[in-house]
Regions:
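N-terminal flexible/basic segments that precede or flank functional cores
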Residues: 1-33, 97-108
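Short, amphipathic alpha-helical "recognition" segments used to contact nucleic acids or chromatin
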Residues: 28-44
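Conserved interaction-surface patches within small, structured recognition/assembly domains
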Residues: 36-38, 46, 61-66
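Short alpha-helical DNA-recognition segment
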Residues: 44-61
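Glycine/charge-rich, flexible interdomain linkers and switch-proximal surface loops
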Residues: 52-54, 95-99
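DNA major-groove recognition helix of helix-turn-helix/homeodomain DNA-binding modules
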Residues: 74-90
Length: 108
């Protein structure tokens, strides 16, 4: 039997798969995961979630299944505020060790 080669990922699946917008996709995935967590914790139906978020039920279903490519980060942040969460955006200088900034998400 041949050995299986395992390569450690970068922590961003979308970057590992070569997506050009990998940072944005990772942030969206994290936002959707938080939305799904709130929906589950509150035991909301997809219909009730759609009413709260101002979306259609099929759109909520797609989001909760991880299909969010056509949804902006802004819209996902708005969904979180409609679910009773405050959103705080912080912009800070990039450390000297990096030339480009990056997007990260911290959830309290």
């Amino acid at each position: 039997m041949r050995g299986i080669s395992v390569e450690e990922g970068s922590g961003n699946l979308y970057a590992d798969l070569g997506y050009p917008d990998s940072e944005s996709m990772l942030v969206k995935a994290q936002l959707v995961a938080k939305i799904a967590e709130i929906v589950q914790r509150r035991a909301l139906t997809q219909t009730r979630t759609a009413e709260i978020l101002g979306l259609t039920q099929p759109k909520v279903s797609a989001l909760l299944k991880g299909r969010f490519r056509g949804v902006s980060e802004h819209r996902l942040l708005e969904c979180l505020t409609r679910l009773g969460r405050d959103v705080h955006i912080v912009i800070k200088p990039t450390p000297r060790s990096r030339s480009n900034g990056r997007m990260t998400l911290s959830v309290a």
